[in-house]
Amino acid sequence: MAKKIVTDLELKGKTVLVRADFNVPMKDGEITDDNRIVQALPTIKYIIEQGGKVVLFSHLGKVKEESDKAALTLKPVANALTEKLGEEVTFVPETRGETLEQSVKDLNEGDVLLVENTRFEDVDGKKESKNDPELGKYWASLGDVFVNDAFGTAHREHASNVGIASNLETVAGFLMEKEIKYIGGVVENPDKPVVAILGGAKVSDKIGVITNLLKIADKVLIGGGMSYTFFKAQGKEIGLSLLEKDKVDFAKELLDRAGDQIVLPVDCKVAKEFSNDAEITEVSVDDIPADQEAMDIGPKSVELFKEQLQGAHTVVWNGPMGVFELSNFAKGTIGVCEAIAELKDANTIIGGGDSAAAAISLGYGDDFSHISTGGGASLEYLEGKELPGVVAIANK
């Protein structure tokens, strides 16, 4: 179902509430990665150009008690927005009250205001995270329309997304629209053939995704730590490699059901320790030494996965192929990333999380059709679940 977007509204003179995702990594009060702020700019700039008054909401981190607040204020985000927009962004260090209400009333057309971290409301009864109806109603009372542009929290039913939406006309911002188009498109109406590449440490994190993608994808390539549970299910010895014993039966059932639809690595890199100084050996997946751990897929597996990608019209990737943080065990992830980036005629999508960070850090950010800003939200969407934040947006 197509959703209404910000361009469907008349915004001039309106107070436009925007739920953005400014949950950025911070160190000593400094933002270390501003990607989420950059991604929010097109929607904010459009509302400014249309003569709307922008009131921004976002969470940052987890706020459990009063002492958490100082390190999790959105003030650095307000400063970053001021710099990127080239105009002063008013920061209100409160989530409710007269100062906030008056500051909103004082806005002129084209002005931007950022409300303090919505999760400050969690200190007293988790009002944000539990979608307190009074809080959602109060925030909604500050504006005329609501634009939800925070895909990263779309799988959560919070006061600042679903709560406001239940009290105010709600549309998608440009980033949310893009996420629905690409991530939702994989699930609902993909351009075939579809190849999915899944990595990461645990099968348990991806059970729903694997199960759903096997209904959609022509091939599901599995790498990373989770692949060794599948090898165990095939009766292979995996040495000290990562194993989820309680998921071996599930992996066996999937392999029996899916047949050659699931493609596993054929070789891997093993070592005795997690270290860039460790002695590395490339071995067949049939020859993993008993005293060593597999930490990356090998070069033959990268070539195999490249072959499987040829001719794909849609590719979705979620999860690294090895211990990407260590350069010794990053080549599998780099190889897969490069192979996908070279597919110029395919829809290439990264489902957030570590694979997104890998692609961006390797300089391939612009070579993918879409890199999702949502980790958990992307996974739940790929599982085929309805996301509360998306459901709450008005249909066209």
Curated annotation (Swiss-Prot):
GO BP: gluconeogenesis; glycolytic process
Localization per record = Cytoplasm
Disulfide bridges in this chain: none
Chain sites annotated for binding ATP: K206, E325, G352, G353, D354, S355
The signal peptide annotation in the UniProt record is: none
Record keywords, A-Z: ATP-binding, Cytoplasm, Glycolysis, Kinase, Nucleotide-binding, Transferase
Entry EC no(s): 2.7.2.3
Q: Residues that bind substrate, according to the entry?
A: D21, F22, N23, R36, H59, L60, G61, K62, R119, R156
Q: What is its main location?
A: cytoplasm
Q: Does the keyword Nucleotide-binding apply?
A: yes
Q: What metabolic or biological pathway is this protein involved in? A: Carbohydrate degradation; glycolysis; pyruvate from D-glyceraldehyde 3-phosphate: step 2/5
Q: Name the reaction it catalyses.
A: (2R)-3-phosphoglycerate + ATP = (2R)-3-phospho-glyceroyl phosphate + ADP
Q: What SUPFAM superfamilies has UniProt attached to this entry?
A: Phosphoglycerate kinase
GO CC field: cytosol
Cite a single GO MF annotation: ADP binding
Top enzyme class, one word, equals: transferase
Instruction: Tell me the protein family, please.
Output: Belongs to the phosphoglycerate kinase family.
Oligomeric state and interaction partners are given as: Monomer.
Name the record gives this protein: Phosphoglycerate kinase
